[in-house]
A protein has these predicted regions:
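A short SAM/SAH-binding and catalytic strip from SAM-dependent methyltransferases
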Residues: 49-52, 57
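Class I S-adenosyl-L-methionine
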Residues: 35-45, 55, 62-202
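Conserved acidic residues
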Residues: 2, 49, 89
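Short, glycine/acidic-enriched loop or turn micro-motifs at the edges of active sites
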Residues: 9, 31, 57, 97-98
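SAM cofactor-binding core of SAM-dependent methyltransferases
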Residues: 1-31
């Protein structure tokens, strides 16, 4: 990961701590250009392999309106813009499962259309993936779109690698994924570190 954009300063600082070589932009993507990202990340004219992100979607289509034009959905437009300004070979767009349901589905179709008009193919049908089927101890469903520039091979969506911890029956002949206890059970009790009340380090 060579660059990341995160509007929340605390989350941006955590990302920078975990990925010190990554150029982190603690600001909104609005007004940030692909050129600025390339400059700060030291990319020059090198190919950007993939842009991955998820943007809040709050406004949905009304009669006679395109949802993608709704100001409340501006961050989705910004994601599309950044992908094209960086001329990324691939993109991964993540969002809530609700975008696939009812009236919201029209907005999803508009997003796909916007990418296709800009020269990207989107792997269809889109997929809703659950993190618990990919070795993550969390029951979290999210919509994913994978896209590639025309002329490049279009990746498939990943197949499950585990089944959720605690599942009563064996599915797909896959191993059980980790539980929350497996993932964090060996961490020390925070209450043993009184200094954390006043500082971020112990």
């Amino acid at each position: 990961v060579v660059a990341a954009v995160e509007v929340d300063p605390i989350h941006a600082a955590i990302h920078k701590f975990n990925f010190p070589k990554c150029a982190v932009f603690p600001k909104s993507i609005t007004g940030l250009s692909g050129e600025e990202i390339r400059k700060r990340a030291g990319l020059g004219n090198r190919t950007v392999d993939v842009v991955a992100g998820g943007a809040p979607c709050q406004g949905f289509s009304l009669i006679g309106q395109r949802a993608l034009d709704d100001p409340r959905n501006s961050l989705v437009r910004e994601f599309v813009r950044i992908v094209t300004e960086l001329d990324a070979s691939y993109f991964v767009f993540e969002n809530v499962k609700g975008l696939t349901l009812g009236k919201h589905k029209k907005f999803l179709e508009e997003i796909i259309e916007a990418f296709e008009l800009l020269g990207y193919y989107v792997r269809m049908p889109w997929r809703v993936l659950n993190a618990s089927f990919y070795s993550v101890p969390q029951d979290r469903e999210r919509l994913f779109l994978i896209g590639a520039k025309r002329g490049l091979p279009l990746p498939e969506y990943p197949e499950p690698t585990t089944i959720p911890a605690g599942s009563a029956q064996q599915l797909l002949n896959l191993p059980l994924g980790p539980s929350c206890k497996d993932a964090i059970g060996d961490l020390p009790d925070a209450e043993e570190f009184g200094e954390l009340i006043h500082t971020d380090s112990a």
